[in-house]
Amino acid sequence: MTTEEESLSAAEEGYNVQRDYWRQAEESDGFDIENIKLPPGMHGRVMGLITYNCQLCYRYPFPVLVKLYAKFGLHRYNLIKGTSFELAALMKFNMLQNYMSSFYMTLLAHDPDPAASSSQKTFQVRVDEQQFGTLGINCSIARPKHEGDLLEVSTKTPFIPHFHGGALGDGIFKGELPDCLSDDALNALMEAVSKDELPEHVLDDALYARAGGIFQGELPDWPSDDALNDGKRFYMLKESEWQATDWISMYLELVITTTDRSITETVQKPEVLSKLEIVKVAIETATKDEEPSNERLKAYRAHFYITFKGLAEPRAPRQVFEIGEHVERQAIVRRVMGHRGDLTLKGKLCGGQYIKRRSLALKSGEESPNCKKQTRVG
């Protein structure tokens, strides 16, 4: 065998081993991969998932962020099923070796509701990062483990280690949301709502999206004070309403930690998040202005405009912010439930001054604006 033939044979063998690795990973949807078998000499040569056992190892990448992703998965489940599960403990997770990764998390969650059938369950949650340096995540799997009726996996979308759109269905979301661009799709949705197969606010969301909507594309700018006073467009939450939900503060923490990952690198950093104080929250949805506020809170498509303070030194790409914990800051978060039940969050910090990119090679004696002590550039 010539050198070229040996090289081709080795490449083909590596390809087959790589393909077989992901075939084995697919059997558990990427969650239980500890027993995947590789041929001798192939360990370290296969690009696959890295496994972290959080019960045995206290040091793992981005501990704060991973737990927020786990909470986000439970939030998706609660939003669809009407439950109140909370994170009890992160047991293990698998992730890709990429800047933007997919996280396959196994966790314990408990439902504080006394009427709940079981106080604690094991959950599996998959979260895919869709952007780096800002909030852009998608959750397509959030389900109790070992519950057959909830482990139905759609065959419409094959297992893909990392994706930027579309969801691998997990059977939690019963029925599909039509795209609502055609009359037939809209009529089908209206029929599903009339039969109580889907909540009414889903129809409101769809009608708004059909009319053009605002829950696509780039995030909006922060609205003016006059616009926020428009009660038909915005609903200003009462303090008791946003305090009664733990997920609004989770949205804010996700915006901050995905923008500045240094906060998530050590277990000591959560003190930054503990100082956050929400001042007010406005919601923009597709639901009617006369709908009860709790319906707006459950809307599958919504913008959340969060005013807060307590973050001394915000960091965001190519932005400069005023420094000080006393400064009131702004964050926008978009929540969208996809037509297969995947939940997406996009978010950003507002209020910073954008700066232009400059050459790294400064002229002799020229001082970089990044060195000024009064401001901090993300």
Swiss-Prot record:
PANTHER family registered for this protein in UniProt: (RAPE) HYPOTHETICAL PROTEIN, CYSTATIN/MONELLIN SUPERFAMILY PROTEIN
Pfam families: protein_MS5 (PF04776)
InterPro entries noted in UniProt: MS5 (IPR006462)
Source organism of this protein record: Arabidopsis thaliana (Mouse-ear cress)
Family statement: Belongs to the UPF0725 (EMB2204) family.
Protein name from the UniProt record: UPF0725 protein At1g23970
